[in-house]
Amino acid sequence: MTDHEAKWDKLLQINTVGRDDKNADEYSYPYEPTPYCVLERLEESGLIRRDDVVLDYGCGKGRVDFFLSRQCGAKTIGIEYDQRIYRSALENQQTGRSRAEFVLARAESYDVPTDVNRCYFFNPFSVEILHKVMARILESYYANPREIFLLFYYPSEEYISYLMTVDELEFYDEIECDDLFTGDPRERILIFSLPQNLFVGDGALDVPFENVLNLSKAE
């Protein structure tokens, strides 16, 4: 653990350091927190504000949630499937004062609240699960059309290839982080958007989840 990591954990009154792969498999990847220096860069981008609701997929012990809640003032929701790690997030919630809340659920089964407008991913699961998660996000979007930003830290080629096939998504920007870590081109946050004006007309669009899932699958 670096001094910088320790400093932030102490400031936020949480314990999130270390890697945990005890329950990892080919579909659900190990717990590894986003480095604080990357979160600082995300904060500096201005993409997360007080009136935003951030959904953190594979939140682990809650580092992203506590940081963005404290530094940006946003409401954050962390989704975690591993009950043991989820309990660690709840323990952090007792000491870290923030607007963060945590849900024990599988990402592909979680109904995305219709006020969520930011989604954060740090390679939490396989691209097969991402297909289903994207369908859930689109279902929420159709129920309440709004601008949503999807942020992918350290994205894999498989993730990028799939995301480029989702018709509803637009590439928005990227936050470069390769200067923070030597020689790794994956050190960046790719940002995709669901624009508010994707559809003509007002009001909710009644699209069943099964239909959305078909729309979001890669060709």
What label would you give each PLM region?
Residues 1-49:
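S-adenosyl-L-methionine
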Residues 51-58:
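Conserved class I S-adenosyl-L-methionine
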Residues 62-66:
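Glycine-rich SAM-binding Motif I of class I
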Residues 75-80:
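Conserved SAM-binding motif I beta-strand of class I
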Residues 89-90:
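Conserved SAM-binding loop
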Residues 97-106:
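Conserved SAM-binding strand-loop segment of SAM-dependent methyltransferases
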Residues 117-129:
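A short SAM/SAH-binding and catalytic strip from SAM-dependent methyltransferases
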Residues 128-190:
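C-terminal substrate-binding/active-site "lid" region of AdoMet-derived donor-dependent transferases
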